[in-house]
């Protein structure tokens, strides 16, 4: 939470940073009510579900803005991965916020100023994205990391402790960069071979 008061006037960028770094449920509600067609969080959830489907989130139904457990509120692991990549590609101006390790809004609650992503600062290229926890889903993490120009996205869910989440996430990142390499087979426009054509204008292409 950002520990917002009903009379606070907060810049949108501060609210976005509060959501990303501090997991600010109150900031989610403020933005949701501002964007909602009817000024309610429920109205925003309907809008978010519709927009999500347009983005390819076909297994997601939202009932609130912050992911708090609610009847009918659900999102698949696959959809989380799709959304993670969309955030990176469609909003490059905001993505660096996911790598911020601390944020103190207006000097409030310094004990709640640290990003909960356990991978940040480990020197493995991690720069996002978001942690989560519910009783049903356990501890989870939507993560991203980049090394030598190659980026990976991954989604973890169902871990039983904070420590398990941190260990599993670091293991996955190290494994992904160690086990896979990028190979360039050809450049655009270059000829890599010929294929025969039957009954065509040319004998091959």
Regions found by a protein language model. Name each.
Residues 1-81, 88-91:
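Active-site-adjacent loops and short helices of periplasmic peptidoglycan-processing enzymes
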């Amino acid at each position: 939470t950002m520990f917002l008061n009903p009379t606070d006037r907060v810049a949108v960028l501060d609210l976005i940073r509060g959501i990303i770094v501090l997991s600010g449920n109150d900031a989610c509600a403020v933005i949701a009510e501002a964007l909602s067609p009817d000024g309610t969080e429920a109205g925003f959830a309907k809008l978010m579900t519709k927009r999500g489907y347009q983005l390819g989130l076909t297994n997601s139904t939202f009932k609130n803005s912050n992911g708090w457990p609610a009847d009918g509120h659900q999102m698949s692991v696959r959809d989380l991965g799709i959304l993670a990549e969309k955030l990176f590609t469609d909003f490059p101006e905001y993505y660096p916020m996911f790598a911020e390790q601390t944020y103190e809004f207006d000097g409030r609650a310094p004990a709640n100023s640290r990003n909960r992503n356990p991978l940040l600062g480990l020197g493995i290229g991690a720069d996002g994205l978001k942690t989560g926890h519910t009783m049903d889903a356990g501890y989870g993490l939507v993560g991203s990391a980049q090394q030598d120009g190659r980026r990976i996205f991954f989604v973890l869910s169902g871990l039983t402790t904070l420590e398990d989440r941190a260990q599993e996430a670091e293991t996955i990142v190290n494994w992904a960069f160690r086990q896979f390499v990028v190979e360039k087979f050809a450049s655009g426009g270059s000829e890599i071979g010929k294929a025969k054509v039957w009954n065509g204008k040319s004998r091959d292409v």
